Structure formats: C-alpha cells, structure tokens
Amino acid sequence: MTGPLWRRIAIPAATLTALSLSVPAFADTGSYGTNDGGGFRNVLPPGQNGLDTLGQILAFRANGSFPKHWADQQPLYDGLLYASPTLTDSQVKDYYKDATFGVKKSNRESTVKPRKGVTIIRDKKFGVPRVYGKTRQDTMFGAGYASANDRLFLMDVLRHTGRAELASFLGGANLNADANQWSFAAYTDKDLKKMLKAPAQGSQKEWNALRDDVESYVDGINAYIKKAKKDGSLMPGEYTALGATLKPWKTTDVMATASLFGGIFGRGGGAEVTSAQIVRALEARFGVDQGRAIWSGFRAKNDPAAPTTVPGSFPYQLKNTFSTKGLALPDQGTTVTPATIIKGSTTASSLQGQSMGDALLQERLDGHHSNWEVIAANKSTNGRPVGVLGPQVGYYLPQVLMELELHGPGIDARGASFPGVSMYVQLGRGRDYAWSATSAGSDNVDTFAEVLCGGSKYKYRYKGKCLDMEKLVRKQSWKPNAADPTPAGKAKLVVYRTVHGLVNSYGTVNGKKVAYVTARTTYLHEADSIVGFMRFNQPDQMQTPKQFKKSASKIQFTFNWAYLNAKDTAYYLSGAYPKRAKGTSPDFPVLGTGKYDWQGFDAKNYTSDLLGFSKHPNTTNQSLMVSWNNKPAKDWAAADDQWGYGSFYRSDLIEDKLEAVIADGKKASLAQVVQAMEESATQDIRAAKVLPTLFAAMEASPQDAQVAAAVDKLMKWVSAGGHRRDLDKDGVYEHNDAIEIMDAWWPKLLTAQFQPALGEDVVNEIRSMINFGAVTANPSAPQFSDGWWTYSLQDLQRVLSGQPVPGGFPIAFCGNGEKVACAVTLQDSLKAALAVTPAQTYGFGACVSDPQPSCWNKNRARVTAGVTEPRAYPFQNRPTFQQAVSVEKDLK
C-alpha cells in the first residue's frame, strides 16, 4: 500500500462528535453494572494509591505503615502462585478483583466533583477511580484529575524522563538515563508541539477532537495541582522531602511521556551496527561464506520451527540479507565509536547510583515479558471466548501503570494506563469486550550510514549536497537531595540529527568516514498512535473483530493485540513498518545518501510508505492464541535485534499446556487458562526444553558417580516440571539443589560447547546481542525470553543425529560434532559447576546473607515515590496488570 507513513484514518463524524452512543444519564452516575456485559476481573499490584503526603512518608519511616490502597492487591497477585497447581473456577475470584463497571452504593468510599459535570467515585475495597463526565471533555478532565490524585509525583518523574531532564529534577544519578532517552527520542519543544498540531494521518477535524481530549486531560491535571497546593492532604510529600518543584502541565508533557513509553515497549530493531560487527568477526575467523552461514544460525531470522501466534504466512523482509546494494558494513578490522552524548559533566559521580530513570532504562534494555492467552468460544467450557491478558511492565512502588474507569458520551472503558498519557484506557475492557497487548518488537527501526563531508563529523552528504547536522542540546544542572547525594553539578546532553534520525555512532565504510543514524518510523510521530487507543475506548469502534483490527492498525507502535467479546476473538500486529528500498538489506546498515531511503520517504515530514493493513499478521476466531513476545507468524522476519526466535520459545510453555487441555475434543475453563499461564510463570525453560536432550548427549560417555548424582537431581527436577518456586513457603525452592546446579552449570556449559570453535572474542561479540540467559550480575527475576537455549539444543540435536537441523548451524560445535567428545565436554563442564558454591553464584547485592535462588529470583519492586523502600515478592514470570475475562453477554 502506498501512502503516508502514518496510515489514513476514516473515523465517522458521528464518532468525533461523540453522539453515536447512548450513555447512562448523569444522574445515574456510578450505577453498578450499567452497560456491562459481565465476566470481567483483573489485578494490578501492589495497589491503586500512589499518593503519599509528607506525614505519611514520615509515618512509614517510623512504623512501616502504608497509606490506604497502596498494597492491597499484592496479596491477590502473590496468592495465585500457591493456588495454581490445584486452581478451580470458583477460586479465580480470590486472585482477580471484580472489574464490573460502576460501584455498588454500599461499596462507595468517596465521591469527588472537581468541577461541574465531573464525578469521580472510588470503591472501599481497592480505591479504583470511576470517572463520569457529562460531556466528553468532562470525562477527559476527570481522567487527568484522577490520574494526578493517584500518581502526580510519578507523572512528574515520567515527563522529566521523557524530556531527558530527570537529573535536573531529581539529581545527578539520573544523568545516564537522561542520556539514553536523549539518544533515542531527542525532541525540541517545537517538535513536541508539532506532533499534535500537524498530524500526518487522518483529517484535521478528527485531530482537533483528539487534541481537545489531550487539552482537557491536562486541564484536569492542573486543576488537581492547583488544589493540592492549597490542601496538604492532596500534595505528594516527595516535593517537600526532595526539594523538587511542581510546575503546571502542558500538552507537550503528554507527548514527551508518550515518547518514553513508546520507546520502551513499542519498538524493535535498530541493532544493525552490532549485527554487522558480529558478522565481521565471524568472517574474520571462518571466512566470508562460512562466517555468514554461522551468523545466520545465530540470527534465527526465520527459523522454520519457531513457535508463532498465528499459523498463517505473512512474509516480511526475508530477502536480501547480504545484498551489496547500499550495504554499509563497517570495514573489516575497524572499530565503531559510540557518539558522545554527555558533555561537560562537572562530577563523575553523577553517573553512579540507582534511580527511577535507571529503572526505566533497564526496562528498555531487558526486553519485554508480557503474555496473553485466548481460547475461542468453540473450545471453552462455557461456550464463550476466554482470555487471560496482560502486559508486563516491571514492578514499581507505586506501580508505573494505574487503573481507571472512564464513562462519558461515546466512551465506556476500564483498565490500565500509563500515568501522564492516561486520557484513555490503554489495556482493559469496554462494555462487552476486552483487549490487551504484548510488545512485539518487530522491526520499525533501521540504521543509515551518513557519509561525512566537508572535513567535519557534523556534515553529511544527502542527495548530492553536503548538509549540516542539526545539533540538539539538553542542558542539565542538579543539586544533592534526600534521595540522591550526588554532588551538585551540570552537564550538556548533545545529539546530532540528520534527515534520517539521530546519530548513534561513527565508523568507516569502504574507507569513508560515516555517521550511523537511528531511523525510527515513530520518531516525530509519537502522537499518531493516540487515535488507536482512543478507538479502543469507544464501543462503536470495537463491536466486531474487523473493527478491532482497524482500531489496532492505527497504533504505530509495534504490539501484539488480542481481542475478545462474548462470541469472537481476534489478533492484530500493529506497527508502522517501512517499505525499504528495493534490494537493500533489512539486517545491516545502508547508505544514507538518499538513493536507498525508505520508499516514499519525505524528509520534511518524516513520513514514508508503509506495509499495508492486510499484510500485518492477524487472525479471527483461532481456536487457541498465545503471545509471550514470541514470533507473530510464519515468514515474519525477526527484527535485527531479536536473535531468540529459535526452534522453541517460552510461549511453548503455555501453549503446550493449553493444547493438552483442549486435545481430543476437550474444552478449557477460565481457571485452566489461568493455571496454564501461572504454571508456566515459574518454569525454567532450560529444564523444560533443553535438559532432556543434554542428558541424552551425555550418555555417549560413561559418567562418574559425581556427575551421575548431579544428573539424577536434575532429572527429578525436570520430572517435577522444572519450577523455580517455594510452595511450602519455607524460604527454599523445591529441588533447590538441582536449580543451584543448573545456574552454576549453564554459563560453563555454553562456554565449553561453543567457545573452542568460536573463540572468546566472537562469543563475547554475540553475547553483546543475545546473552547466555544465565544468572546476572545482580539479583533479578529470570524472564527466559532470550538466551542461548535454542542454540545449545539445536547443536546437540545435530551431534546426536549427525544431520543438519533445519534453521540451525552449518557446523556442529559441541565436541566438534563427535558424540563421545561432546559427552566428555558436557560432563567436564558439569563437574566444574559442581565446585561452585551458592555464595559464588548468588552472594551479591540483596542476597549476600541469603545466597540461594529463592532470594536471587525475587520480583523486586523499584521505588518511584518516597513512602516506601524496595520490596521483594516471590518470583513469577507473569504480567504486571492482568485480566481474567469471559464476557457473559453481547450488548450490541
């Protein structure tokens, strides 16, 4: 499809004027179950409230008492871990709260009317705000007011992070996080204003309606700020405790916050330079042909055995991997130098320490961990679709997501949103439908190599002209505060922008100096996706799978969207995917001279032609759908930074269980779907998928008693499901010895299996793209998303069979392909692991005094406000916000 980068939208005028739907009379505000199809439950730990006054902060320091509704959903969330093995349908309500529209009169905790036409009602049990507006703008105002009530200080942190100004706001320890944001989403105020003023898709009329929503939302935030400055019971105590200044909000703050979350959860690709460095290292060691073949095995771009959400084929960027057309690989033997972002820092310690900015930066680096599972009506016990849905956004105190319910002309929705962009529910339910997402990580980011000219690293050649790069500067200054003792200092963040995007590094291509530039389709267009979220909240845009897909297609960030109502289910992969210049490589940098631009590229408006609607992976009423950030569909190439889509993925853990549940004509209940998710949430993928083949490979050589005893422990762990959990709550995992062996063995195993052939330098190069998946340097919960498990398995399968494995490597690594030599290699690596003590594996950070897996793996909540300190919860590899849904009736 040819058209602008941000596809055209055709929203009926009736939708824009919000007159197409009936809503309950304003006098009936809060009526329980009004316009509700029934069957909705959810949980969002730790709790709804994020407001802590100075007095509450001091009370917590004195006696550890939380403000009300700060942590009352955590017991539900944690409790499912222990109930999961024997979960029944009647127990689901014990672990997911009622998410029905409205509040029963007997359950109303508070009613606030911040202005005429706006009513906000909260329930006694969990304090979730229900916002009712007489007009659409009243509803948006209420959303802003309620959001500020629950997350004002966090919203301030987020807008400053989005603007790369967090160091100036909260201290110099945040400077690295600011530099990361500035390198990825550097915007001037003019840029942010333009995002809402001059949309690249749809009519100006519909964007006027959207802009009115944003402005009313900001008005609501500012109304709360104004009131809080007069009423200390509404003012977050962090402002006083940290000496931070509270300023009014602007619409540009909403755009800056959107750029932050879009950059963390809604992008994929952009690692072309790293990939190029790896292929160069392999070429140097094995020669060009063999080196590239080995690179392809690790790359796993389109492994034929990779699990997918939909079975159909949706071909995208499969060809031309090593095309020489415009190819800009760094010259062999040369280095690529990262661009310097931080300049003029007056204190080295400003780069140290932990901060909220660091936490969000880590989410960007860690990858994505959401999952959802949907069963079609013909496969469920109640004859209606069943869904367990949720995004994983990490764990924070207070949570970086918040829940709200919105009602007004044309709007009925409840669910989770990111504070600061919460004018709409982003993940949740409507009248008689629910939707959710996982990060897809599909390729919407490329790298162009700008050929430098004019004897300067800040000039580049484009379409025959030598152009100046645009210099973008963010000045920073900070003082020490109660949370960050970094000495006072100042610095400048500097990036350079070309027509393609932001400069990330410098290198040499064919002897010419180049600047490598990140080109992201959503850059300068963060606002474009708002249209899709707006539609999700409007029942007349979400009545059918077709309408849902059209709504989801307006979201330019890369997400796997799931939908279900009382009859149907659907899936759609959203995202703005560029049509690359014909014949160019989608895997490596290409020259930015203008000849190899994206098709239809308009440098002035930063638009181009996009992949058409029907070309995106999608399906309707598929019997079973699972997404755990896995590959969307066959022949949909993994993004250049995604090397983990091998012959199995963690989504198999859930899908295998559900396939067994519905096999032979059987049907699944809601509890069984919840159980499949939760049982998988504590499994170690290595135990479930790799160890059985490892044991088989080790049998080619006799085992001594020490090895045999270790293997016996591991086998018993595998037979029990390979879980990392403590069901009896004694503080020690079941099969703890086996888990300790596995964690100590894994890095030694991979080193022994691959390093003799690859060499240490090449192994480290590959690990810069995809790490082993072993125990990390600091206590952390394992996600089992990306690691070397499929590499190890496919290599061992080749050794055992003596035959190439489809999608695998061109050579055998373990023991050079000899069964006995491989077995000895594996056994020797296991022996070496048995000499490692738990203290050597886990005795760091928070686990110095408790060096064991159950300590190391805990879900540790990062603090985003001052009332509390870091908390640790039992490990679950599970979504943060989660819905359990089976819609009871169709209201259409």
What are these regions (language model features)?
Residues D28-L691, Q703, K716-K892:
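C-terminal/peripheral segments of proteins
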Residues L691-P702, A708-A709, K713-K716:
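Large, well-folded core regions of big proteins
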Residues M1-A27:
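Secretory targeting and sorting signals
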